[in-house]
């Protein structure tokens, strides 16, 4: 239904208002949202038999976060042009702790979206994805999540926001690290174990700096194939956003060569 509505109204990105509007009257839509954000997803057909958005994701912004929706669409199209994996998502910026061990010695954030991430972000794609019933405390009518542990690799992170009636964007580079299963379980159980998790390291931005500057509880993330490309793609994305009239702020360690 969501994909058919997007086709009918000519939408390039959509959000479903189940938080807070629909959560008390219908099941949560996270499983659908995670699938729609994945390029390789089950096909959807129009009533006349056309396959809708064939071979592409339909970027979806969780909780109808319109700034995240704008970021999702721009990032998906730009990364596709750059030959990079275009699947992207927002996450809740929850909490973090310094972790030492297993090749990691850094402050590692808990990025946790409230229900669904694209399977392309998981280590083994769909094979490592699962679906849990949404916690009744948040979603009394249930609904399935799209859950997994995000794979290690370089990322570009960002946040588009409105300040002084002008669109701004903070962006930088980071890394997803691989933590041991017991540490992943500890972090999951300290937050919401039904939801997908990403172990995020934000390069050059401390915990206190992030908490002081970041303008939302959401952070947007997308992978690149290597670290050098992450820095280059971050710069290209900043240029694209600036050309659209968005005020850009580089945050942390972004290389300019």
What is each of the regions a protein language model found here?
Residues 1-257:
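Anaerobic metallocofactor- and corrinoid-dependent redox/one-carbon enzyme cores
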